[in-house]
């Protein structure tokens, strides 16, 4: 927001922006409109009505196809885990929502066991600390965190992975000094001392979620960072699962080549940037723009990696 404020203070001819938070910047966009500065969104947009154009991948279509491909990889049944790069951007929300909708409509035997939002570590720390410490769960068996976020539920309405371990009292009424264990066998309570949320690392958070569900067969990751986080998790836990994700940096390509990633949504970053500049220039000149410019995507697999058309899109 501060960067946008600085740029608007220079009164540019137009602004092109990838909106990281759908609820942010509306005041700035209003100020831009008052100053006759057109705003074009690219990669990730918002519902703001004053945008001159939205230039991006069709995230919903790509996510639905990702669900189909992951379903095929896991045999159309079983548990999967989602790694979502954030909980606020339009691109992340669209990729998650459309993926869920496709599974619900066509693959009822696939259960989303856990979802890890990469921008909500503190929430996850609170939830997991509560589970580790054996705190009481909410109505319906859900364990809420500080913001009331509940665990993923299976299709039977029960929380995926069960509840935290409750400490028992000795016969004399005094609490026993005992250790609780998480799904992976890690000691989480010792001598009656509670685990503090902020002492749990991100790796421990993810591993805890993963260890609760040892039968996870697939992972859906919504951008390059999420794919890498999924790969790191599988490596730490010496586990295997099908991975379907977005983007294609060098680490992802290496994982694709050696079979650790099944397939990737390859976007068109050059085309997206080019189209955003053209749309911004047209808006500055009061020329018409398409409301939505779809820059397309292709599926990248180990077999298609060396195709000439694929190589043109890699960055």
For the regions a protein language model found, what residue spans apply to each?
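A residue-level marker of the well-folded mature domains of exported/periplasmic proteins
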Residues: 1-315
């Amino acid at each position: 927001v501060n960067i946008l404020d600085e740029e608007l203070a220079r009164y540019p001819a137009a602004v092109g922006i990838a909106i990281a938070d759908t609820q942010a910047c509306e005041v700035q966009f209003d100020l831009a409109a008052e100053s006759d500065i057109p705003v074009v969104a690219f990669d990730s947009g918002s519902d703001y009505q004053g945008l001159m154009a939205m230039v991006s991948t069709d995230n919903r279509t790509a996510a639905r196809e990702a669900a189909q491909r992951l379903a095929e990889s896991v045999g159309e049944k079983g548990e999967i885990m989602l790694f979502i790069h954030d909980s606020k951007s339009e691109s992340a929300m669209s990729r998650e929502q459309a993926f869920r909708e496709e599974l619900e409509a066509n693959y009822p035997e696939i259960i989303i066991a856990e979802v890890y939002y990469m921008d909500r570590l503190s929430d996850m720390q609170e939830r997991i600390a509560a589970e580790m410490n054996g705190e009481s769960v909410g109505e319906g068996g859900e364990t809420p965190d500080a913001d009331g976020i509940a665990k993923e539920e299976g299709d039977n309405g029960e929380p995926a992975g069960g509840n935290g371990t409750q400490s028992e009292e000795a016969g004399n009424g005094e609490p026993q000094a005992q250790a609780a264990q998480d799904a992976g066998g890690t000691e989480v309570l010792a001598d009656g001392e509670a685990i503090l949320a902020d002492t749990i690392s991100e790796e421990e958070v993810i591993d805890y979620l993963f260890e609760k569900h040892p039968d996870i067969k697939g992972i859906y990751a919504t951008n390059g960072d999420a794919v890498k986080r999924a790969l790191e998790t599988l490596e730490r836990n010496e586990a295997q699962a099908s991975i379907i994700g977005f983007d294609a940096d060098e680490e992802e390509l290496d994982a694709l080549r050696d079979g650790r990633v099944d397939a990737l949504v390859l976007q068109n970053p050059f085309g997206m940037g080019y189209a955003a500049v053209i749309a911004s220039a047209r808006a500055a000149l009061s020329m018409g723009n398409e409301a939505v410019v779809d820059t397309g995507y292709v599926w990248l697999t180990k077999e298609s990696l060396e195709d000439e058309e694929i190589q043109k899109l890699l960055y």
